[in-house]
């Protein structure tokens, strides 16, 4: 299935993230929870 936009933004490779995005550090887009 498709990811929600804010979940998709979590990872740089556009992989499906969890339900929460870790907004810590400079690479927040790569930090998924």
UniProtKB/Swiss-Prot annotation:
The record marks 6, 11, 30 as: Important for stimulation of [3H]ryanodine binding to RYR1. It comes from the Eukaryota. Changing residue 33 to A: Loss of stimulation of [3H]ryanodine binding to RYR1. Residues 22-24 are annotated as: Essential for stimulation of [3H]ryanodine binding to RYR1. Changing residue 3 to A: Linear IpCa; Loss of stimulation of [3H]ryanodine binding to RYR1. Changing residue 22 to A: 69.92-fold decrease of stimulation of [3H]ryanodine binding to RYR1. InterPro entries: Scorpion_calcine. This is Imperacalcin. Keywords: Calcium channel impairing toxin, Disulfide bond, Ion channel impairing toxin, Knottin, Neurotoxin, Ryanodine-sensitive calcium-release channel impairing toxin, Secreted, Toxin. One of its GO terms (cellular component) is extracellular region. It comes from Pandinus imperator (Emperor scorpion). The record marks 7, 31, 33 as: Essential for stimulation of [3H]ryanodine binding to RYR1. Disulfide bonds join 3-17, 10-21, 16-32. Changing residue 10 to A: Linear IpCa; Loss of stimulation of [3H]ryanodine binding to RYR1. Changing residue 24 to A: Loss of stimulation of [3H]ryanodine binding to RYR1. One of its GO terms (molecular function) is toxin activity. Changing residue 13 to A: 3.08-fold increase of stimulation of [3H]ryanodine binding to RYR1. The lineage of its organism: Eukaryota, Metazoa, Ecdysozoa, Arthropoda, Chelicerata.
């Amino acid at each position: 299935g498709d990811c929600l936009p804010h979940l998709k933004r979590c990872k740089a490779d556009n992989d499906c993230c969890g339900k929460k995005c870790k907004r810590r550090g400079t690479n927040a887009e790569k930090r998924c929870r």
